[in-house]
Structure formats: C-alpha cells, structure tokens
A protein has these predicted regions:
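Flavin (FAD/FMN)-binding glycine-rich loop and adjacent Rossmann-like elements that form
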Residues: 1-141
C-alpha cells in the first residue's frame, strides 16, 4: 500500500425530492455515510493503465465511484501527492515509467515512503477523521 484512507464512504446522489420538482436539474444532493476501517490503497491506483507516463494523484485516481467516496478528501489526496512525488523522483532517476517503478523499483519507493517527507522535530498534533478507530463498528453490506 502507498497510503491509507480513513474517511467514511461518502456517496452523493440527487435528492429524490429535487428530482420530483426539478427533473433533470437536481441541484441539491443527499449523502450516504458508511463508517469504515482505515484501508490501504495500492500504488497501482496512482498511474494510468494506458498512458505510459501519467500519474494521477487526486480525484482522478483510478478507483470505483464507491472507493472515490473515501479517497477524495484533502488529507488523503495530499498523501497521494507525496507518494507520486517520490515515485516521480525514481522515474527520473531510472528513466522509468510509473509502471516500471511498481515492477522494478517498488522496494526503493517503499523505503522512501517509510522515511516520509515531513519536517522532523514538529509535534504530531494534527487530528483527522480516524475512521475505524472510533468506537463505531463499520457496516459491511
């Protein structure tokens, strides 16, 4: 895994009331939130399957619409950016494609991810949605 997502499954859909009153022009959405355990996201989600030299770090990540409901938030997309930056440095170092990093240099990427990019010596006092670490039991459908 290259990063972990902790956000609940957060799916938006048109509000049925607005569908009735504004057919085809729904402007207000409702959401379904499902609490999840944090889960790891594979590095392979961060590069294109059919364009050799294309990384995707953000809401264009290669996932299903349900998985996008958990990875589209800012903290998680920031972690994607860190991993893609590390992988891009290896692409330059080895004149390799993102897919090559997975096949030939994954251990080196893991080593970079283990070190991290954070500034050393700063307190780790940031709070975020801790997903499955809450006292709620995630729903599995």
């Amino acid at each position: 895994a290259s990063f972990t997502t902790t956000w609940s499954i957060d799916l938006h859909r048109p509000d049925p009331e607005n569908t009735r009153y504004f057919p085809g022009r729904e402007f207000k959405a409702t959401t379904d939130h499902v609490v999840i355990y944090p889960y790891p996201v594979p590095y392979r989600c961060l590069y294109s399957r059919n364009i050799d030299n294309l990384f995707m770090a953000g809401r264009n990540i290669s996932v299903t619409h349900v998985a996008l409901g958990t990875v589209r938030v800012m903290r998680t997309t920031g972690m994607m950016g860190e991993v893609v930056g590390m992988a891009a440095s290896l692409c330059k170092k080895y004149q390799a494609t993102p897919r090559d990093i997975y096949h030939y240099y994954l251990e080196e990427l893991k080593s970079l991810m283990q070190k991290g990019v954070n500034k050393k010596g700063l307190p780790n006092n940031q709070r975020y949605n801790e997903g499955g670490r809450l006292n709620q039991i995630p729903k599995v459908k």
